[in-house]
């Protein structure tokens, strides 16, 4: 049997090694997509054809969905405060596996990468207690890459280079949700929130099951939703569930501001696209590093406590063991 490892280009590897944050997309049971910002800290091995990121064990819902349907995508979409100067937009798609109990050796090996991207690890009696769950109760999401698509610019325009499996046909339209497709949140207020975030990404499930994530611009709104603009040919015609991410960040992810949406995307035959948001949630991280770490530590503690108390952590382990 021949080698099926996907090996991406030098340009894509430079982006993957350099970006401070990446948009991670996963599929929902209803056929939608959720897209969230994560810190990959340079995780990736081109020789093995793998990428990855870490997250908290307290985020059980996200992890459970990835375990149930491991089709994921990672969109390397911004050079802010990273180590790459490439103008390319890189979309990697693959099958994820979740390492729920990484070995101490793996966590220790990961430490220097965290320092490079996110700054020195805090240590000392108070910090050790505060950040125990944030530092130690981490899980790794490893992605066996099936395809890497590289566009020549961050707007994803121009002819892309594809490494791995060829791109599938456009995804067919989906049936609308029972609750209807119209907006369920205040569109005008939401567009005001999005306008403050320079990075905006739209995601949906492709015909082969992998999420597709592309950069978009927001161009006006009305009672039906807000209009999104992408390079010609990127958005599939028809209606479908879709996720949306808008965010900004400072060096080492201090002052991170993010807003995540789920909703309905409708693309007309002429390419005009309207997004009707159904859910919206966001947060703004503290603008100072120590305050950010305190916030992260407390959220990790609460998430881990909630996951343990509800039995979500054990259910997740049992589900992962079945796969």
Question: Where do the model's predicted regions map?
Answer:
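A short, Trp-centered hydrophobic/proline-enriched beta-strand micro-motif
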Residues: 18-28, 72-76, 198-205, 243-245
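Charged, gly/pro-rich active-site loop segments
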Residues: 2-4, 83-189, 229-323
């Amino acid at each position: 049997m021949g080698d099926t490892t996907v090996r991406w280009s030098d340009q894509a590897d430079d982006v993957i090694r350099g970006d401070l944050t990446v948009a991670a997309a996963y599929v929902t049971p209803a056929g939608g997509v959720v897209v969230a910002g994560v810190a990959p800290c340079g995780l990736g091995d081109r020789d093995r054809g793998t990428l990855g990121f870490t997250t908290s064990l307290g985020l059980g819902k996200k992890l459970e969905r990835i375990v149930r349907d491991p089709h994921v995508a990672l969109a390397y979409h911004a050079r802010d405060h990273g180590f790459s100067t490439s103008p390319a937009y890189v979309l990697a798609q693959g099958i994820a596996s979740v390492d729920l109990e990484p070995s101490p050796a793996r966590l220790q090996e990961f430490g220097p990468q965290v320092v490079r991207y996110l700054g020195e690890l805090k240590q000392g009696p108070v910090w050790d207690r505060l950040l125990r769950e944030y530092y130690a109760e981490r899980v790794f999401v490893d992605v066996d890459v099936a395809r890497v698509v590289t566009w020549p610019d961050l707007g994803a325009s121009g002819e892309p280079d594809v490494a791995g499996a060829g791109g599938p046909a456009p995804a067919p339209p989906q049936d609308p949700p029972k609750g209807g497709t119209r907006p369920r949140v205040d569109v005008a207020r939401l567009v005001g929130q999005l306008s403050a975030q320079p990075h905006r990404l739209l995601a949906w499930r492709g015909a082969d099951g992998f999420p597709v994530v592309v950069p978009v611009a927001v161009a006006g709104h009305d009672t039906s939703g807000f209009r999104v603009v992408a390079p010609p040919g990127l958005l599939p015609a028809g209606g479908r569930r879709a996720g949306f991410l808008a965010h900004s960040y400072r060096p080492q992810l201090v002052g991170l501001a993010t807003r995540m949406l789920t909703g309905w995307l409708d693309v007309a035959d002429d390419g005009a696209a309207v997004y009707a948001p159904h859910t919206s949630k966001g947060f703004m991280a503290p603008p100072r590093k120590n305050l950010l770490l305190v916030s992260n530590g407390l959220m990790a503690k609460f998430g881990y406590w909630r996951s343990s108390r509800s039995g979500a952590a054990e259910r997740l382990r049992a589900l992962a063991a079945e796969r």
